[in-house]
């Protein structure tokens, strides 16, 4: 089970954007990749079509889940998340640094 979900704040651990923070837009659990806002931006050269003009367009490329770390909303630092079970059987994510529940 992945500990990264859509709309989580994450810290980039390696690569050209190391140290930057962003929000997760898309998670692909089968490929082990995520897309983060304004991180790993690449240029795509497109030909003109009937619908849109050609040119150079910038877009976010996927980044491996192993290269990012979840940011705890309480302590505002990069931390790993662990899963705890509640008495009713639901799984929740908990920050390993401060013990706060991550929604």
From Swiss-Prot:
Signal peptide interval: none
Q: Name one GO molecular function term.
A: rRNA binding
Signal among the record's keywords? no
Q: GO:BP terms for this protein?
A: translation
Q: Spell out the coiled coil positions from the record.
A: none
InterPro entries, per the entry = KOW, Rib_uL2_dom2, Ribosomal_uL24, Ribosomal_uL24_KOW, Translation_prot_SH3-like_sf
Stored SUPFAM superfamilies: Translation proteins SH3-like domain
Judging by the UniProt lineage, the source's domain of life is: Bacteria
Q: Name one Pfam family in it.
A: ribosomal_L24
Any one GO CC term of the record: ribonucleoprotein complex
Q: Which UniProt keywords apply?
A: Ribonucleoprotein, Ribosomal protein, RNA-binding, rRNA-binding
What Gene3D superfamilies does the record tag this protein with?
2.30.30.30
Relate the protein's function as given in its record.
One of two assembly initiator proteins, it binds directly to the 5'-end of the 23S rRNA, where it nucleates assembly of the 50S subunit. One of the proteins that surrounds the polypeptide exit tunnel on the outside of the subunit.
Recorded hits in PANTHER family, A to Z, give: MITOCHONDRIAL RIBOSOMAL PROTEIN L24 (PTHR12903)
Q: How does it assemble?
A: Part of the 50S ribosomal subunit.
* Family named by the database record: Belongs to the universal ribosomal protein uL24 family.
The protein in question is named: Large ribosomal subunit protein uL24
Q: Which organism is it from?
A: Endomicrobium trichonymphae
Q: Which gene encodes it?
A: rplX
